[in-house]
């Protein structure tokens, strides 16, 4: 299909624009990565008050302080500042990064009650296995359209199981 390369380019341009910092964002309380690292266990969910244009759109649509979620997986390798968190990013897809990336963000930690250490590790390993998947921008757009009155909604986009948005990443990890 000849439109596919054009749509792919448009998606990359849109993702790059959405990933830019939101000049109006004010962080109420920045995270301390070292304190977080002492507190976190594999499988913990991090709610993030993001600082990008995309984050502003998500917060407006959801009427929430939190625009993003990620999962703490523990150090992926033995290097200092090794990636310890996995997220689905609008520009880069499912990726690993260090807690240091959240230094300028307000973060809240959520932990599933009743999971054993083995179950928490399984959640983390399941998320690590999805590294490299693309971001499902169409799914994100579909969720945004759900906020519109019924008569203003265009036809549905299909959800791509080979791609993820941050919330589906969390859901898949805990199934």
Question: How would you name each of these model-derived features?
Answer:
Residues 1-174:
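Cysteine-nucleophile amide-bond enzymes
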